[in-house]
Design a protein with these regions (language model features):
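One-carbon transfer enzymes
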Residues: 1-128
Length: 128
């Protein structure tokens, strides 16, 4: 069973799809931790409603590398095998990406790098 760490900054719609897949047996995984850099993000409430462990890590007034160090500690402390970035609105450090190389997937609603920063229908309309 894959032990997931989910990182998101927005509503967590994809988190709900993952939870549903785990619950119906189509995904052989468990969510060990949900991390957000946005304390107002609904993904944290969604995690709480589904009785999943969650953690807010502020990205204010710290370097990208320090944020990555803090996130890595939380992920490792929670036994994470694989990270899913779903609606995660922060660029991660090179060090973080290298440390989690081959263990991280970014679910992005846009075609990168041309439409970076786009979300939802706005980005789909731009692409079309």
């Amino acid at each position: 069973m894959l032990k997931l760490g989910i990182m998101g900054s927005t509503r967590g719609t994809d988190l709900q799809a993952i939870i549903n897949g785990i619950n119906n047996g189509s995904i052989d995984a468990q969510v060990n931790i949900v991390i957000s850099n946005n304390k107002e993000a609904y993904i944290l409430e969604r995690a709480e409603l589904n009785k999943l462990p969650f953690k807010f890590i502020s990205d204010q007034e710290i370097s990208r590398e320090e944020f990555g160090n803090r996130a890595t500690k939380v992920l490792k402390d929670n036994g994470v095998d694989f990270i899913l970035l779903i609606g995660f609105m922060k660029i991660l450090s090179t060090k973080f990406c290298r440390e989690w190389s081959d263990k991280i997937l970014n679910v992005h609603p846009s075609l990168l790098p041309k439409y970076a920063g786009g979300m939802n229908n706005k980005v789909h309309q731009q692409v079309l």
